From Swiss-Prot:
Keywords: ATP-binding, Kinase, Lipid A biosynthesis, Lipid biosynthesis, Lipid metabolism, Nucleotide-binding, Transferase. Its EC number is 2.7.1.130. It is an enzyme of class 2 (transferase). It comes from Salmonella paratyphi A (strain AKU_12601). It catalyses: a lipid A disaccharide + ATP = a lipid IVA + ADP + H(+). Transfers the gamma-phosphate of ATP to the 4'-position of a tetraacyldisaccharide 1-phosphate intermediate (termed DS-1-P) to form tetraacyldisaccharide 1,4'-bis-phosphate (lipid IVA). This is Tetraacyldisaccharide 4'-kinase. GO terms for biological process: lipid A biosynthetic process; lipopolysaccharide core region biosynthetic process. Belongs to the LpxK family. Pathway: Glycolipid biosynthesis; lipid IV(A) biosynthesis; lipid IV(A) from (3R)-3-hydroxytetradecanoyl-[acyl-carrier-protein] and UDP-N-acetyl-alpha-D-glucosamine: step 6/6. The keyword GTP-binding does not apply.
Length: 325
């Protein structure tokens, strides 16, 4: 229902307009207070790059963060990553991730980024505290914040917005009548706009999510996902239909698709109940970091990597690396 409201297919969004105006008024006032200097943002001693969204829901932000970390690492830059840690609850913050840190403590996206890149990752509701924790423990040259475009308490040097190229900005209204955290005009002030799927507009960087080989959660074995049979697909991400469409495009045709809430806690019994005899469970990599500890032999995940097109990605990377002392 919420997707139909935000896309404009349902007229129920009109009933939510008073709340949206209130949201827009409050969020605009917060940003203006920092812009006018009425509130002070904390500035880190190293450059900060924010990768975020203008809309609620999954846009492909985490693959972009991983892409950016890996590209900077390839250029010899020491990178740290901070996050709010949605879906996790630590005993104390800030929490600096270790190989033993669980998704219940840190959230699924920070654990995924940590496992994929090996970069230092810290989570905290207050991003500045997470940055300070990384700087105290690691000699990093730059910080990337996973989400946090609207977290103005942390000063930033570069702002990158990730846009779903198919859904774009829906009906264009602020939450909850629409998907917008900020107005689309905010794009005029960011350094780069990356468009995941669909058709990028002038000045935007086109991106596609490229699937790799399916990986078995227990053994690490790899195979073409189309070779798996009797698939049950599970996706606990911001926009599950994107994952199901990716499986179809790979030639894997699930018998059943199970959409879950983003950052949803996954109990072993609940996941096991999804798969019948002779069936194979295929999930996102973000779900896999939550399920690996209790995975069955017939559980697989499909990793995806961000593929950015054109000359703009290199120019963006050059701009970012030029900030590193």
């Amino acid at each position: 229902m919420i997707a139909r409201i935000w896309s404009g297919e349902s007229s129920l969004w009109r009933l939510l307009l008073p709340l949206s105006w209130l949201y827009g008024l409050v969020s605009g006032a917060i940003r203006l207070s920092y812009k006018l200097g009425l509130k002070r943002a904390w500035r880190a001693p190293v450059p900060v790059v924010v990768v975020g969204n203008l809309t609620a829901g999954g846009n492909g932000k985490t693959p972009v963060v991983i892409w950016l970390v890996e590209k900077l690492q390839q250029r010899g830059v020491r990178v740290g990553v901070v996050s709010r840690g949605y879906g996790g609850k630590a005993a104390a913050y800030p929490l600096l991730l270790t190989p033993e840190t669980t998704t219940a403590e840190a959230g699924d996206e920070p654990v995924l980024i940590y496992q994929r890149t090996g970069a230092p990752v810290a989570v905290a509701p207050e991003r500045a505290a997470a940055v300070k924790a990384i700087l105290a423990a690691h000699n990093v040259q730059i910080i990337i914040t996973d989400d946090g475009l609207q977290h103005y308490r942390l000063a930033r040097d570069i702002e990158i917005v990730v846009i779903d190229g198919v859904r774009r900005f829906g009906n264009g209204w602020w939450l909850p009548a629409g998907p917008m955290r900020e107005r689309a005009s905010r794009l005029k002030t960011v350094d780069a706009a990356i468009v995941n799927g669909g058709v990028a507009r002038a000045g935007e960087i086109p991106m596609q999510l490229a699937p790799g080989l399916a990986v078995n959660l227990r053994t690490g074995a790899r195979c073409d996902v189309a070779q798996l049979s009797n698939i049950v697909a599970m996706a606990g991400i911001g926009h599950p239909p994107r994952f199901f469409a990716t499986l179809e495009a790979c030639g894997a045709h699930p018998q059943k698709c199970v959409p879950l809430a983003d950052h949803q806690t996954l109990a072993p019994a609940d996941v096991q109940a999804l798969v019948g005899e002779g069936q194979t469970l295929v999930m996102t990599e973000k779900d896999a970091v939550k399920c690996r500890a209790f995975a069955e032999d017939n559980w697989w995940f499909l990793p995806v990597d961000a593929r950015l097109s054109g000359e703009q990605p290199d120019k963006l990377l050059e701009h970012i690396t030029s900030l590193v002392r």
